[in-house]
Structure formats: structure tokens, C-alpha cells
């Protein structure tokens, strides 16, 4: 009996040692992954900077899995409760090793694709399509990963498993987003598309986007983007509706004629409601049918200029450092209500967008840095996209570029109605307070808006053209978009409610 007990003690000690070694490997692997996640940007991930840490994580997770998967521990699998813990550790370590190995392999393929020649539009279109294929393959394999048992686990193992589930879900969401973006862009570049494109100015805001001040078209052919020239939306405004509107858009915003003036389409932040109306308006005015609609604002141009470097527009060279000051201040110097000078000023935003497009088309732009800039612009609603094709629209939605608010999203925006360019100087602060009451929760959002307009701005910027909007006076509204599930919405402290009710997938106040 003592001999048997001795053997069991020795076996238990050696088994504990193997599990302890596995725990150390898992910890070192987690540290490497944390470094990758915390310190590296999208561009870093595709420029080999993540590769060393990923290899470290891959090796550590593989060692941990080898320790736990060892035949030495097989007897533990049949021990009640203990076997479940070992099974869970085995599955988690194997999943971690698989994910890092897949990620490392996929990154190597991405780096190989991006290092291949892509100087021409056609070559870049092929790269995008191949990137979509790589992400699709990685995504399908990640979806098949099993994490083992989830119940009756030790607290420390349950916590590790829950963390892994959270991280794996984030990875899957990121892969879905990346694949959808690559598919949508590849479709745009490959299939002779024509999109209506707006340039928006954040100096005069609508809810969740700048006012659409210039409109034009961009067509694609074998990867090449061709801009058809921009037109001032002020000049395109119609005295009568260009197309009928219905539903929430008509009920909330119909009185301001968004179907007659492109500048009022952004009153609703729901781009999937606005874009089809814009496409119908454009067809009514020009006879051109478009396959989709894009918007690009000043912040997006700044992100893109950081990649392309300086561009020339209207005889002026502009870079990422000065584009906001130029478009928010400098371009308005000397501008009056004179139609000729005003039209010249309005054209500058479109000319700048054309310059950026030319720089991207010309080659020599890092695709990794371009992808990072586009990702940043999309996350901030600075680039919005809609497609008339349901499959491509679904890709834009998954990529986060559709401007569609989710069922739990809250958006606080400003709507400028003061005939001025003072939005960059408005400081909006908000506080959220939650008060649970049984199954319900009272939500209070306190918002304050401070006008910090500095002295010395050009007269055209500060307004004063109408009695209702004196110089330096901000006339407009705060728009609060809430989940559809929010009920009993009330307000106090404002000067009145101009719109309340359903607005697409949200409620607006």
C-alpha cells in the first residue's frame, strides 16, 4: 500500500510540475499577445513588426499544449472533476496555439502580397481581392476552433476561458470587418462601378457628419478611380422636391426638404436612409444612375494626406498638418456673399479631394498605411458608404462604413442652422447617469454646449448674415440618437424640440 501511495505521490508531483510548466508557457504567451494588441497599429501588423511577438506567443502556446496534451497526464482525464479541468486546459492551450499559428501564417501571406508589385490600379485591385481571400480563409478556420468544456470549471480556469472567449469573439468580429471591407472595395474596383461622392465640411455640421457641400461621381475600371468633377450642392439645390421621401425621413425631417437640397440630407445620421434619396436626386438632375454613394469629410482628407503627403489644389499646396486650418479658416479669408468668390471657395474642397485621389492613383503610396488611414476614418464616421447592391451594402455595414447606428448605439451630434462655420469651436460635453429600477433602467444624459469661437476669424466664418444668427452666435440644435428600446423620452433645459420619434433603427430627440 505504501508503495502504491508513493507512486501516486510521485505521479501527482510530476503531473503538477507539468501543469505548472504549462501555466508558465501560457503566461508568457499571453504577455506576448498583450504586447501585440497594446502597442501595434494596423500598419505595424502588416509590416512585420508584429511577427516576432507572434512567433513568441505561438511557441509558448504550443509548448503549453504539448505539456498538457502529454500522455503522461492521460490518467487524469478519467478522474471526476479533475479530468474536466485538464480537458479545458488542453482545449484552451490548443486553441491559443492554433490561433497564433493561423495569425502568423496569415500575416506572412499578407506581407508577401503587399510586397509584390502594385504600382498600377489593376495590380492594386488584384492585391485587394487576394487580401480578401486570405482573410476569408483565416476567418473560416478560426470559426471552427473549439474551446472545450465551459461548465464546472475551477474559478481560475473559468476566468481564463471567459477571457479567451471575449478575445476570440473580438478577433472574429475584426476578421469579419476586414473581410467585408476588402470584399466591398474589391467589388468597387473590379466591377465598373459609378458612385455618387460628396465632400463634407465639418465646419458646418449635420448629425454625425459634415454638411455635404460638393457632389460629383467616381467611376471605376480595372482598379482605376476616375473623378467626374465636383459641383456645389448650393447650386444643385432645387426649389421643388427631386424625388419623393417617406417613412421616418419624411416624418422627422421632411419640413426641411432633404429631397430638394443635398445639404439637408445629413439631418438624420442614418446614412442608409439618406444615400438612396441622394442617388435618386442625382438621377433626377443628371440622368445618371449610380451604384452607390460615398462621403468624405475634412478629417478623412487629413488622414489620407498623412499617407499621400502634400497635394496641390487650386494653386495651393496642402498637407495633413494644415488642411483643417485651411478649410476651416484660411479659405474664407476675403470671401463675401459675392457669388463668384463664394463659388471659387466652394470648389476648393472638391479640388482637394481630387488631388488626394490623384496622389493615391499615382502609386508609391503604402497600401498598409492607406488601409490604416481608411480604417481610422471609417471608425470616426469620416467616410460613409452605401451600395444599391444588397450584398455589397451588407459588406459596407459589416465593415462599419455604412453609417448605420446599431440597436444599442447612442450618438450626440450638432446640427448647424446659423449660416456660419462655427462648429469647430463648439465644445460639447456630456454625462451619462444610470439608475436601475427593477427590470428597467432610468438613463439621464446631461449635455452642455459652450461656444468657444476665438476672435479674428474671417467675417464669412462667424456669420451675421441673418438677424436670427448674429456674429459669433451659434444657431442650431443638439441631436440625441437613442436605441429604439428607449421609452418615455423627455427633455428639459433646452429651447424646444424640433424633432422627436423614430429615425431608422434609432429614436431621435
Short names for language-model regions:
Residues 7, 11-509:
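Non-catalytic, solvent-exposed segments at the cell envelope interface
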Residues 1-5:
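N-terminal Sec-pathway targeting helices
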Amino acid at each position: 500500500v505504501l508503495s502504491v501511495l508513493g507512486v501516486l505521490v510521485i505521479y501527482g508531483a510530476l503531473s503538477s510540475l507539468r501543469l505548472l510548466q504549462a501555466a508558465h508557457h501560457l503566461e508568457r504567451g499571453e504577455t506576448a499577445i498583450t504586447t501585440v494588441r497594446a502597442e501595434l497599429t494596423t500598419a505595424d501588423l502588416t509590416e512585420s513588426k508584429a511577427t516576432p511577438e507572434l512567433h513568441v506567443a505561438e511557441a509558448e502556446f504550443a509548448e503549453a499544449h504539448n505539456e498538457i496534451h502529454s500522455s503522461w497526464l492521460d490518467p487524469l482525464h478519467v478522474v471526476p472533476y479533475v479530468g474536466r479541468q485538464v480537458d479545458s486546459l488542453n482545449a484552451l492551450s490548443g486553441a491559443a496555439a492554433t490561433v497564433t499559428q493561423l495569425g502568423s501564417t496569415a500575416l506572412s501571406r499578407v506581407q508577401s502580397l503587399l510586397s509584390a508589385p502594385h504600382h498600377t490600379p489593376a495590380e492594386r485591385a488584384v492585391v485587394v481581392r487576394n487580401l480578401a481571400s486570405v482573410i476569408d480563409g483565416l476567418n473560416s478556420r478560426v470559426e471552427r476552433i473549439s474551446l472545450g468544456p465551459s461548465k464546472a470549471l475551477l474559478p481560475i480556469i473559468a476566468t481564463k476561458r471567459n477571457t479567451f472567449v471575449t478575445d476570440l469573439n473580438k478577433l472574429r468580429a475584426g476578421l469579419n470587418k476586414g473581410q467585408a471591407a476588402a470584399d466591398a472595395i474589391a467589388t468597387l474596383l473590379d466591377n465598373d462601378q459609378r458612385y455618387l461622392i460628396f465632400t463634407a465640411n465639418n465646419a458646418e455640421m449635420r448629425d454625425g457628419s459634415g454638411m455635404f457641400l460638393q457632389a460629383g461621381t467616381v467611376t471605376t475600371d480595372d482598379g482605376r478611380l476616375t473623378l467626374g468633377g465636383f459641383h456645389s450642392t448650393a447650386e444643385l439645390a432645387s426649389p421643388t422636391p427631386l424625388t419623393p421621401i417617406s417613412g421616418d425621413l419624411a416624418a422627422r425631417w421632411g419640413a426641411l426638404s432633404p429631397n430638394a437640397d443635398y445639404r439637408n440630407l445629413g439631418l438624420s445620421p442614418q446614412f442608409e436612409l439618406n444615400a438612396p434619396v441622394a442617388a435618386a436626386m442625382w438621377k433626377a438632375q443628371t440622368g445618371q444612375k449610380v451604384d452607390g454613394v460615398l462621403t468624405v469629410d475634412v478629417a478623412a482628407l487629413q488622414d489620407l494626406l498623412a499617407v499621400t503627403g502634400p497635394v496641390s489644389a487650386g494653386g495651393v499646396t496642402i498637407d495633413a498638418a494644415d488642411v483643417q486650418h485651411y478649410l476651416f479658416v484660411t479659405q474664407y479669408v476675403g470671401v463675401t456673399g459675392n457669388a463668384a468668390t463664394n463659388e471659387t471657395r466652394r470648389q476648393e474642397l472638391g479640388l482637394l479631394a481630387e488631388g488626394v485621389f490623384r496622389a493615391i492613383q499615382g502609386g508609391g503610396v503604402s497600401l498598409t498605411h492607406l488601409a490604416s488611414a481608411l480604417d481610422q476614418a471609417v471608425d470616426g464616421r469620416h467616410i460613409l458608404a452605401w451600395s444599391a447592391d444588397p450584398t455589397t451594402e451588407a459588406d459596407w455595414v459589416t465593415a462599419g462604413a455604412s453609417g448605420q447606428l446599431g440597436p444599442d448605439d447612442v450618438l450626440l451630434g450638432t446640427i448647424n442652422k446659423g449660416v456660419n462655420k462655427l462648429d469647430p469651436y463648439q465644445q460639447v460635453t456630456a454625462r451619462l447617469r444610470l439608475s436601475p429600477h427593477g427590470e428597467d433602467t432610468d438613463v439621464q444624459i446631461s449635455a452642455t454646449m459652450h461656444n468657444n469661437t476665438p476672435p479674428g476669424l474671417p467675417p464669412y466664418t462667424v456669420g451675421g448674415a441673418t438677424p436670427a444668427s448674429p456674429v459669433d452666435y451659434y444657431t442650431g440644435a443638439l441631436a440625441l440618437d437613442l436605441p429604439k428600446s428607449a421609452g418615455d423620452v423627455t427633455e428639459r433645459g433646452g429651447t424646444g424640440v424640433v424633432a422627436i420619434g423614430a429615425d431608422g433603427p434609432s429614436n431621435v430627440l
